[in-house]
Amino acid sequence: MYAVELDRSKRLLVISAAQRVTAEQAKLAAQRVRELLHDVVPGFRVLADYRWLDSMDPAAARHIAEIMDAIAEKRAASVTRVIPDPHKDIGLNILSQFHYGPEIEITTFETLADALQSITAK
């Protein structure tokens, strides 16, 4: 399952993945990200919460890449990830190398509290 929200007042895109994510769910999430970012100006931040993710279909990878491309095209300032278990990275670090430019700051935290503290400190 994927959820995508945009808090315009905080200029924060929140992406959450939970349980088992299918390729179709990832595809819908990519479409939703593009819709929400349509009129967003550069410099917004992204919080990607993977605390409740159990697994992701390998076919979802291309849609995750589409999400990353949309974020990069709209020139996000930063991407903050919450991944409690580094072994459940699901290839995000590798995909990031190809889909985010060096101008996007990427940080990963094990807890949501640490991630939020990092975001609010910026």
Predicted regions and their residues:
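Amphipathic, Lys/Arg-enriched alpha-helical "gate/interface" segment within cytosolic domains
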Residues: 1-122
